[in-house]
């Protein structure tokens, strides 16, 4: 379960 902020931060 990945937060929305983590999606743009790591990817």
UniProtKB/Swiss-Prot annotation:
InterPro entries: Bombesin. The modification Pyrrolidone carboxylic acid is found at residue 1. It comes from the Eukaryota. Transmembrane segments: none annotated. Expressed by the skin glands. It is found in: Secreted. The modification Methionine amide is found at residue 11. GO terms for biological process: defense response; neuropeptide signaling pathway. GO terms for cellular component: extracellular region. Keywords: Amidation, Amphibian defense peptide, Pyrrolidone carboxylic acid, Secreted. Its main location: secreted. Coiled coil: none annotated. Belongs to the bombesin/neuromedin-B/ranatensin family. This is Ranatensin-C. It comes from Lithobates pipiens (Northern leopard frog).
